[in-house]
Amino acid sequence: MAKAIQEPTNPVDPVEAYLNLDDDVLDGLSDGDFLAQQRLLLETERVHYTEQAAQLRAEADSMVQNNEPAEVQFDEESGEGGTTAIDRERDLALAGSALAAIEEVDLALRKMDRGVYGLCESCKQSIPRARLRALPFARLCVRCKEGGLPRSR
């Protein structure tokens, strides 16, 4: 009796596998393979931030609809008089951050299309692959991000 071939129960997520590559393996990828992996990573990030922004806006809108001003108690016992407004503002701020990240991702994808992805906007040198993998929409190399080398005294 022949054994049936079993499909893996936990298929490997290609983005997760890429994120777990050793730096030596990452540096050994061809430019084309590296850019293809980065594009996949950026597109995955875009989906994540889009979903996050939509969820946070929906939660903020729900707070407004579910908590009419007449229902809010401002006594010492409830202790929740201002928390709805604070929670809503927090959700809106986080949604704004997610939307800003989407803009950064879109810019990185446009740079990829123009052939300038991975170049530091300040010094025009290549941003290390490990930094781009960690922050795929990085605009600056670490040196420029930190403001250059400190002056000696």
Report the location of each language-model feature.
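Cysteine-rich micro-motifs
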Residues: 138-146
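Interaction interfaces in information-processing and related assembly proteins
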Residues: 2-114, 152-153
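Residue-level signal for mature regions of secreted extracellular proteins and peptides
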Residues: 113-116, 134-137
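Short, cysteine/histidine-rich loop/knuckle motifs that typically chelate Zn2+
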Residues: 122-123, 143
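Cys/His-enriched microdomains
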Residues: 118-121, 139
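Residue-level signature of catalytic and energy-coupling elements of molecular machines
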Residues: 42, 123, 132
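Short functional micro-motifs and their immediate structural scaffolds
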Residues: 110, 127-128, 149
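Short Cys/His-rich "knuckle" micro-motifs
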Residues: 130-134, 151-153
